[in-house]
Amino acid sequence: MTPQKSDACSDPVYTVGDYLLDRLAELGVSEIFGVPGDYNLQFLDHIVAHPTIRWVGSANELNAGYAADGYGRLRGMSAVVTTFGVGELSVTNAIAGSYAEHVPVVHIVGGPTKDAQGTRRALHHSLGDGDFEHFLRISREITCAQANLMPATAGREIDRVLSEVREQKRPGYILLSSDVARFPTEPPAAPLPRYPGGTSPRALSLFTKAAIELIADHQLTVLADLLVHRLQAVKELEALLAADVVPHATLMWGKSLLDESSPNFLGIYAGAASAERVRAAIEGAPVLVTAGVVFTDMVSGFFSQRIDPARTIDIGQYQSSVADQVFAPLEMSAALQALATILTGRGISSPPVVPPPAEPPPAMPARDEPLTQQMVWDRVCSALTPGNVVLADQGTSFYGMADHRLPQGVTFIGQPLWGSIGYTLPAAVGAAVAHPDRRTVLLIGDGAAQLTVQELGTFSREGLSPVIVVVNNDGYTVERAIHGETAPYNDIVSWNWTELPSALGVTNHLAFRAQTYGQLDDALTVAAARRDRMVLVEVVLPRLEIPRLLGQLVGSMAPQ
């Protein structure tokens, strides 16, 4: 490989830091998020000088981690840089969320020099006990691979960590001491090696035989989820759905994984909280294929799914099962391809999916009618266009949108497993940086936005023009629905949302406050026309109203 060293860097020597950057560039990373600190400053010089990687500074480390997560979901790899101790601990929540939700993020920590560590002195940003691996040990719980780089083995260790991150689709951790970052080394001699295929021909053959026997002449029904996307098996899943008439649904975690405008798309399955048509089709399917499905509490109606294992083919990351038979090692893509081959080879066509009963279109609300949850999400969904990237924060925004069918080509991002409120605002920065040609739409509650709102200014600095809908329902409405309807701990300070962008350095924006349907309609109409500006719309909703789906989930919730 040709080294990517730039003359813009004052150091003409090719270094370990350059090696790391070139490997990240090879994996598709063209922006790195983070916050400077004295232990990483010289490494940041190399980022700035790199010919294909750009530095994107964040307002704080937590936001940088969230931004890297949003970027990684769309690009398939991302990186965040922090300083030792104080910086890396600040980003820990974001990294844990990336681990839970299978997002490949490389966390690079600038550390003290090896000589300074060797003295075991009480250096700043440490715990003062001379042990400089406390935080490395913490990282082992929330990353799939870790390395404390040493000069002699740095290249090999970088390759190991990056390979694991690429393979497992989870974060990795690299402790890069400032002197190691400057240490001379050779550039990569070959592309980062890929793991050999993880499918046993015998396992695949036995799986195929068992699947043929179970499927017979039945119509397949498919329930798919997030891991299909993370494991880059979407094309194989789409080929399976095209092999016959295959009714299919997703969980909320995998929303937008499949084309929701397809006549064969049933909707969102959420256990007992599902629409009855969806629940009956999934739970009553003669043969159900579950692809990349993880039944978490918040997407399964608190584990109310009723799936018969005897009629289920379950496709996982490294193994699959047919009824009670398990086959491994068997990669997801290979198992999906085998099922598609079975359907195309059996020479029969399944009947078309019966469409739901036609319903009269809802009456258009009066322009002076106060906003409701249903009005807001209906109108937001009608404003979406192919290519939009929609991020819905964990709350009324996420569950309000989950029930709505999205146009083809819209990507939906939420965080229903980790559920860290405020995540989506910085993640929207990362998503917009990853694909600036696709307009980002952020849907977030007032309480969640107060946690991470500093990143509004980053949108402006980076020349991004998202549409941001802030749901002002005067506090933590989801928590009020669960417990403490009038409790003071669910109250928040009221902010002037329409003035906030200017205070945070946004220079090219429009801001609206909508209390009625007409005001919301006007604001979103302007937002659609002004793609050159950030448009913030504050929508004022009753403090106790929640979307239908969220109400059903809360009603079935038991103390966990």
From Swiss-Prot:
Family: Belongs to the TPP enzyme family.
Domain of life, source organism: Bacteria
Binding-site residues for Mg(2+), renumbered to this chain: D446, N473, G475
Entry keyword annotation includes Magnesium: yes
Alphabetized PANTHER family for the sequence: PYRUVATE DECARBOXYLASE, PYRUVATE DECARBOXYLASE ISOZYME 1-RELATED
Record's keyword terms, sorted: Allosteric enzyme, Decarboxylase, Lyase, Magnesium, Metal-binding, Thiamine pyrophosphate
Protein name listed in UniProt: Alpha-keto-acid decarboxylase
Note: Was identified as a high-confidence drug target.
One GO location term (cellular component): cytosol
GO biological process: aromatic amino acid family catabolic process to alcohol via Ehrlich pathway
One Pfam family matching this protein: TPP_enzyme_N
Stretch list, region Thiamine pyrophosphate binding: 396-478
EC identifiers of the protein: 4.1.1.-
Source organism of this protein record: Mycobacterium tuberculosis (strain ATCC 25618 / H37Rv)
Described function: Decarboxylates branched-chain and aromatic alpha-keto acids to aldehydes.
Regulation (activators, inhibitors): Allosterically activated by alpha-keto acids and the corresponding amino acids. L-leucine, L-valine, D-valine, L-isoleucine, L-phenylalanine, D-phenylalanine, L-tyrosine and L-valine are activators (with L-leucine and L-isoleucine being the strongest activators) whereas L-tryptophan, tryptophol, phenylacetic acid and indoleacetic acid have no effect.
List of residues binding thiamine diphosphate: E61
Cofactor dependence: a metal cation; thiamine diphosphate
GO MF annotation terms: magnesium ion binding; pyruvate decarboxylase activity; thiamine pyrophosphate binding
InterPro entries hit by this protein: DHS-like_NAD/FAD-binding_dom, PDC/IPDC-like, THDP-binding, Thiamin_PyroP_enz_cen_dom, Thiamin_PyroP_enz_TPP-bd_dom, TPP-bd_CS, TPP_enzyme_TPP-bd, TPP_PDC_IPDC
Cofactor binding annotation: Binds 1 metal ion per subunit. Binds 1 thiamine pyrophosphate per subunit.
